[in-house]
Amino acid sequence: MRGYGALVLAPLVLVACSGGGGSPGGEGKSASATGSARAEPGARTSEKPDDTGVIDADPARLPTSPEEALDLIGRVIAEPATFGPGVVKRSPYESDPATWPVLGTDCIWRQQKPASSVLATLSRSFEVPAAGGKGPMRLSAVVTVHRTRDDARWEMAESVEETMRCPTQQLRQGELIGSMIASSLGQEKGVMDSAEDFLLESGEYQNAELGGGPYPYSWYLSQSLQFTVAVTGKGAKGWSQQEIDVLANQAHSTMLLRLGAAVEKQS
């Protein structure tokens, strides 16, 4: 998976990885969606300006510099209301754009400098505060702008590889995700009309500060053009997988719509 060569993303029907789970909660995989240390691409495939995939993009509206990429991210990335009522900012709210999470060979996530294929990336953290006998549900949203579409596709491929390589992953001290199931649905009807590829992971989340767990965990990642959009939901006491997915899906879908509006051709 680390060699670049000609990259073909055949839809992955289902990959089930048994893992122990642990105690995750903060950002790790959830914040950066995929941040594994990647081999730098050797020969890049040149892309035609009009080769814009599902979104009918205007080449002039596609970012080509870090500054343009951060500006676009600011117009696309979720805020609390994007998820729905009751969701608030969590501190720290935004990540440092100069870093992103990288999954090491020891299956521990650490902050490192983004790969050279990344123009800009940003994550935001949210939560539904504890109330009514339920613990705090933690949410995150991430938007990454790559230099090329192939770079974004490579992120999707790496995400599947990471789940298979590390069925249990440490997000930070006392936080783990495990028992992961990953499903890549490609462009199947009804998934995400504006996404070229879509990956859903679900599993178990453990957090020592929240009583251990395991609790439900969901992670949505989609790719369109040179962009990837991700949302993570981490449960706590009293939260069901379905409740987490409702909020995560709402934010993920909204960001995809915003992305299309930001780069598509204008009549």
Pin down the residues of each PLM region.
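N-terminal export and membrane-targeting signals
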Residues: 1-10
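C-terminal motif of bacterial Sec signal peptides marking the signal peptidase cleavage site
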Residues: 13-16
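Bacterial signal peptide processing site
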Residues: 18-21
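N-terminal low-complexity, Pro/Thr/Ser-rich intrinsically disordered segments
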Residues: 34-76
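A small/polar (G/S/T-enriched), proline-flanked helix-loop surface module common
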Residues: 51, 55-62, 87-217, 251, ...
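Short, well-ordered beta-strand elements
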Residues: 139-142, 226-235
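Short, surface-exposed beta-strand/loop micro-motifs that present aromatic residues
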Residues: 216-224
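A short acidic/glycine-rich loop-to-helix N-cap element
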Residues: 233-250
